[in-house]
Amino acid sequence: MPDSKYELLFLDFDGVIVDSTKECAALTWYAGKDVTNQTLSSLLSVVPDWFDQRFRYLRPYMRTLDDFLVSRLISSDIRVESQDEFLELRSGIDASAIEDFVQDANALRSYWSSHDYRTWLGSHVIFDGIHDLLERYSKRVYVVTAKDTESSQDILDHFGLEQHISGIIGEAHDKALAVNSICLGRYVDPRATLFIDDNIVNCVRVSGTGATVNWAAWGWTSLAHFEAAGSANLAKLEMADMMYI
């Protein structure tokens, strides 16, 4: 085994490796609208403050791109204090509306990344400590994310991190399955791996694989998530703790 604590490292992308709130909020606001005649920089600057605040408020409960639509449809005075409350709101949205939104959002992200590449990349920020962590585990790191693979790859390339990544599993709705599949393919016992995510649901599900699971407290979190992490006996990982992994 290499001279580090784990044989493989599994990392979420948004909220663990990169802060992409600005881009995700804009994507949600503009998806389905004809904005191709405007620059991305101008679009980013005029996302309504009230919507940006609502998106950030709900972000801890949104696991995948299809969840983002909730932030655009619910009233601003609705309060969400648990994952179950969020899922109840989401269940009230027609499945076809969600499907259309995801298609529109992916198309818009692809347009931005191909027509205004530098601005699109610049709307993302790498969290402190990630560079060093990836360097220590170079070629033993898998990104398991709900984000699409191409966008994740582009951002990693931009920040010079792609050299450390063994693979990206994009649009992953079942992260436990992804972890098990990679471990099987690499002949690694899941118990010799570490999974880091800022979403409580993902952490709980992956803990069933036998992998060591750390909940990233610097990601999209709320007080309810801190309480849920304690109830689920999840190990909390602070940004400053990454140097000890």
Task: Describe the predicted segments one by one.
Residues 6, 138, 165-166, 210:
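Short, well-ordered alpha-helix to beta-strand connector turns
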Residues 10, 98-106, 110-143, 176-177:
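Short, acidic loop-to-helix structural element flanking the phosphoryl-transfer center
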Residues 190, 194-235:
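Acidic, Mg2+-coordinating phosphoryl-transfer loop and its flanking beta/alpha structural elements
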Residues 16, 23, 149, 201, ...:
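Conserved Rossmann-like nucleotide-cofactor binding loop
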Residues 1-63, 70:
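Active-site neighborhood of HAD-like aspartate-dependent phosphohydrolases
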Residues 50-121:
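A metal-dependent, Asp-based hydrolase signature
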Residues 167-171, 231-245:
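Short acidic-hydrophobic, aromatic-tinged amphipathic segments that line or gate anion-handling sites
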Residues 142-194, 200-208:
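Substrate-recognition "cap/lid" segment bordering the active-site pocket of phosphatases
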